[in-house]
Regions:
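N-terminal, active-site-proximal structural segment of metallo-dependent hydrolase catalytic domains
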Residues: 1-145
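Metal-dependent phosphoester-hydrolase catalytic domains
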Residues: 4-18, 22-35, 39-56, 62-68, ...
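Active-site beta-strand/loop signature of hydrolases that rely on acidic residues for catalysis
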Residues: 22, 96-102, 116, 120-142, ...
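Structured beta-strand-rich core segments of catalytic domains in phosphoester-bond hydrolases
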Residues: 44, 71-92, 118-121, 130-216, ...
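Acidic/histidine-rich helix-loop elements
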Residues: 100-115, 212-239
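Active-site environment of divalent metal-dependent phosphoester hydrolases
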Residues: 104-108, 138-142, 159-161, 186, ...
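Extracytoplasmic/periplasmic, Sec-exported soluble proteins
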Residues: 112, 116, 155-159, 184, ...
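Short, glycine/charged-enriched secondary-structure capping and boundary segments
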Residues: 112-114, 146-149, 218-219, 276-280, ...
Length: 339
């Protein structure tokens, strides 16, 4: 009786896992948007079905083969989720780049800690990446004192204190903005053409549509309700739709770039998503090629989410990648080294 119930539950979850594999290929701005929800929870579907496979092995049941086959069909997604062995092609690098959503430097006291802004500035200056890309950059009065001779500060919304910032130790000879505004215009993508040695690269710094979860949405994790689930699903649906339009605009602009590209920022979406699939086409993923572990970049109540990225053109050589678990924002900074 118990095995029969577990088998039915397992088959339903395997079907959900199988459907999640389609998430990167289906635009969420269609009636098939629920597939994007399955892509979002792919890591959890994978874990649950792996546990079912282990259970069937222990019980000596042939059902295990169905689990193994469906799980292995998603091998490409597993490779983007978990890196078991770190690749490092060289110990020398020509330049480094950091991407960091600083969450307005804790302007609204989300973190119960003093001097968060000063701590972020100190951390960044100590790391001293060659190129620094900041999202949710808050500067109501004066710009923070980062140690860089060149910069591109773009507005993130109509409030002139909300910005995007790209700092560089190398000369910036051209810069601009990709128009991706939506209903709430706090999403933006800026680009900077930078001279490194005798070569030039274009660095895109993007912040895509947030899910805009409220306090009561996070409380759903502790006290699940039907109303709470409906609220979260509706917010996700809206943000999926917005990001689908935003990535198309960014991708079209990247196709016009005369230089090799580095695209970094807060995508607010996972590797098993339409967003990631579209933006990573023709580019390499720093974490996938030089990272280790699960690469979690979101520092919040939803664990194991990788939503911040540094993608790069094949002409560039990745040397190293790391995620710094610095708890000064709801995101962790990520750093890549290149030749």
């Amino acid at each position: 009786m118990l095995n029969g119930i577990l088998y039915i539950l397992n088959m339903l979850l395997l079907f959900a896992l199988f459907l999640s594999y389609a998430s990167p290929y289906i635009s969420p701005d269609t009636f098939l948007w629920p597939i994007a929800l399955l892509g979002l929870i792919y890591p959890f579907l994978l874990l649950i079905n792996c546990l079912f496979a282990l259970y069937w092995i222990i019980r000596f049941k042939k059902y295990v083969w169905t689990n193994i086959i469906i799980i292995l069909l998603g091998y490409a997604h597993i490779k983007n989720l978990i890196i078991i062995q770190k690749n490092q092609t060289s110990t020398d690098s020509q330049f480094t780049i950091m991407s960091y959503n600083v969450r307005l430097f804790n302007a609204y006291d989300w973190i119960n800690k003093d001097n968060v802004k000063e701590d972020i500035i100190e951390y960044v200056n100590n790391e001293s990446p060659s190129v620094l890309c900041l999202q949710e950059f808050y500067a109501p009065k004066e710009l923070p004192k980062f140690n860089y001779p060149f910069s591109h500060i773009g507005l993130q919304n109509e409030r002139k204190s909300w910005r995007m910032a790209t700092y560089s130790k190398f000369p910036v000879f051209n810069k601009g903005t990709v128009s991706i505004s939506g209903e709430r215009t706090n999403n933006v993508c800026i680009y900077s053409d930078i001279v490194i040695g005798e070569d030039s690269i274009r660095v895109y710094n993007a912040h895509l549509a947030s899910n805009w979860f409220q306090k009561e949405d996070y409380e759903f994790l502790d006290r699940p309700t039907v109303e709470g689930a409906e609220s979260i699903i509706e917010r996700l649906k809206v943000s999926f739709f917005k990001r689908a339009k935003q990535v198309k605009a960014i991708k079209a602009h990247m196709n016009t770039s005369p230089n090799p590209i580095i695209l970094c920022g807060d995508f607010n979406d996972t590797p098993t998503s339409f967003t990631y699939k579209q933006l990573s086409e023709g580019l390499n993923d720093s974490f996938a090629n030089a990272g280790l572990g699960i690469g979690q970049t979101y520092n919040g109540k939803f664990p194991a989410l990788r939503i911040d990225y540094i993608l790069y053109s094949p002409e560039l050589e990745i040397v190293n990648f790391k995620t710094s678990e610095v708890s000064l924002s709801d995101h962790y900074p990520i750093i890549s080294a290149f030749n």
